[in-house]
Amino acid sequence: MSLAEAKKLDKKFPTFKNEFAIPTFGSLGIKNNKYESSTESIYLCGNSLGLMPKNTKKAINDELNAWVERGVESHFNHPDKSLTPWVDIDLPLLPLIAPIVGAKENEVAVMGSLTANLNALLIHFYKPEGKRTKILFEKQAFPSDYYAFLNIVKLFGYDEKHLIQLEVQPGETYIKTERIIKAIDENSDELALVCFPGIQYYTGQFFKIEEITKYAKEKSQQIKVGWDLAHAVGNVPLNLHDWGVDFAAWCSYKYLNSGPGAIGGIFVHEKYTIENKKSSFVPRLAGWWGNNSQERFKMLEEFDPINSALSYRQSNPSVLDVVAVKSSLEVYAKVGGVSKLREKSVALTQFLQDLLTNSKYYIPQSSTSNSKFGFKILTPLNPAERGCQLSIMFQPHFDEKDKNVMERVNAYLHDHAIICDERRPDVIRLAPLPLYNTFEETFIAVQRLFEALDNISKEYM
């Protein structure tokens, strides 16, 4: 693998880097005599926080101007007639987000934040009855998911024994699908809910959403299946409606590039809302923004839910958040959507993998040695089982920060304005995004990583 090959691949796969604001050495406060302060960074951290689309600043300023010019009247009479009055600010996003998650427009809503949305959905979909009380998920789940699952069972008077957690097996780096299927089989009479991440935040594993959902539903329609799509939305093609997923929640500040802490979203299959009459109404966390919009401002003490996922909204959404999401979704629409980007994403991450696995420092996943100097790739090596992220675990481990291999590699990368995500104690997550990363900068980033290891390895020779 060479720089020339990287440049050749960049000619084959277009970049949309010019749509985004890229941090520079200067803006990051990094002083390196080899680079001008205006030199752009290599940003491989979109799996943590995506970069800002250039149009976002104008989109937010337009709404700030509306606030200045008309105040509360902008809810129904926006000063810019080309823009949406605030009362309906989130509605234009539905046709933009629906294709990204593979849903009908009536199955999605832009609302809340990831864990708040997950909790709201659990209130509706976790319905323990008889011995069917348990939730199946992963041991290494993002902690916020664990807190949500633990608290929902406690709200119903159960304890943590009603949580079934699958762990990564010794000698493996991620959970194999067959183990999830086996766990569903073994607990099918006791399961109320199955909920996994679409993509595992730490390892980057892309779970087989369709296969797992279908199998659980075949065992019993009483088993509800939900997904945390924080690392999947905007990263890999999804088809939630056709896959028969009951519900899903996501954030929008990673691959959807909508800004820190930005508003999230939900999917609820239309079978739960399309005939949502009083006779079949299922209680949920309700609020006035989920009520019939024609009745909302009459202030009636009667909840008449919208016949769509919008009925799960509780409060009016943040206007500034929503337009930030919209500006990013418009970029996705402009470039042809996630499916169009997937071909480049697979090629880009495979290029990264090939560079890493051809290194003298590469240690195969099957190796049981923890003392050998180098790194393992925790992520599945099969492109179909991952998104754009590769998680690299450095060894041997040292508790002392000045000796820790990962800490030292990450510091070297940062000194060269290569921005990635560290997960203590020993993992760096590299995520080349097809929207704004190139093969050339991926090649350069890996060479800098090897330089860091060369410097450290002298202590082990």
Swiss-Prot record:
Belongs to the kynureninase family. Its EC number is 3.7.1.3. GO terms for molecular function: kynureninase activity; pyridoxal phosphate binding. Pyridoxal 5'-phosphate binds at residues 114-115, 142-145, 228, 231, 253, 288, 316. Pfam families: KYNU_C (PF22580). GO terms for cellular component: cytoplasm. Keywords: Cytoplasm, Hydrolase, Pyridine nucleotide biosynthesis, Pyridoxal phosphate. The keyword Nucleotide-binding does not apply. Pathway: Amino-acid degradation; L-kynurenine degradation; L-alanine and anthranilate from L-kynurenine: step 1/1; Cofactor biosynthesis; NAD(+) biosynthesis; quinolinate from L-kynurenine: step 2/3. Homodimer. One of its GO terms (biological process) is anthranilate metabolic process. Its cofactor is pyridoxal 5'-phosphate. Its main location: cytoplasm. It comes from Candida albicans (strain SC5314 / ATCC MYA-2876). The modification N6-(pyridoxal phosphate)lysine is found at residue 254. It catalyses: L-kynurenine + H2O = anthranilate + L-alanine + H(+); 3-hydroxy-L-kynurenine + H2O = 3-hydroxyanthranilate + L-alanine + H(+). This is Kynureninase. Catalyzes the cleavage of L-kynurenine (L-Kyn) and L-3-hydroxykynurenine (L-3OHKyn) into anthranilic acid (AA) and 3-hydroxyanthranilic acid (3-OHAA), respectively. It is found in: Cytoplasm.
